[in-house]
Amino acid sequence: MPATPAYPPHSAPRLYVDVELSGGTEIRLDGSHAHYLLKVMRIKQGDPVKLFDDRTGEYLAHVTALGKRDLILSIDGKTRDREAVPDLWLCAAPIKKDRFNWIVEKATELGVARIMPVQTERTQGQAIKPDKLRAHMIEAAEQCERTALPTLEPLTKLTAMLEQWPADRHLFFADERIHATGEGSFRSALVANAGPAAILIGPEGGFSDAENEMIRALPQSVAVSLGPRILRADTAAIAAISLWMAGRGDWNVMKSL
């Protein structure tokens, strides 16, 4: 048996597996995982692999047996516990397929806890394919070294989402119209509204007047400005997540908030 590797190099492959892991056990990989390791990475016996399970954390394993279409890994031990996930949801109207996939990938990288596609009056995106969106989330988490995956909710109508909105969760929504009034500072909103939060991003063309009224009527809603320029939906989503993570999340940038 090969010697147990030290902590894996940064170049070690890293994969999500949908099974609870523990040190001192073995795991068999086949399908897409095996194809990636065997055909793409050209992995060899004894090579290190990082695994995470979205349950307990990240583990170091090494290859003990190779087949044509599968391989066996021995799990040496845990390298990190599952991360504490900032309590931020992203509620976003679907846009063109590739750009919405990009939003999901980047929201995962930035650390959100939950992603909820929202159907609005002006939503023009194609039908949501949950399996493909989840695949984008997993790939993003593997690459950015997250140990937790966001929860992916089914497509929900805006009206239904607002009717069922949790009483203890702030809903920050981007409204480009309020910047000219001098109101809607995101920093001020973060100072005044600590606790569980969500960011609501509308479709290309924004929310309808009726939808704006419904959102503003929600006691937990907080209108915010993302600056003097009109942002595309995908840009707005990433900008808003970044501002929240800097002020209230785990970036520890605005420590005075």
Regions from the PLM with identified roles:
Residues R14, E26, P48, D70-I72, ...:
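Structural motif
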Residues D209-L257:
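Structured adenosyl-cofactor binding patch, chiefly the S-adenosyl-L-methionine
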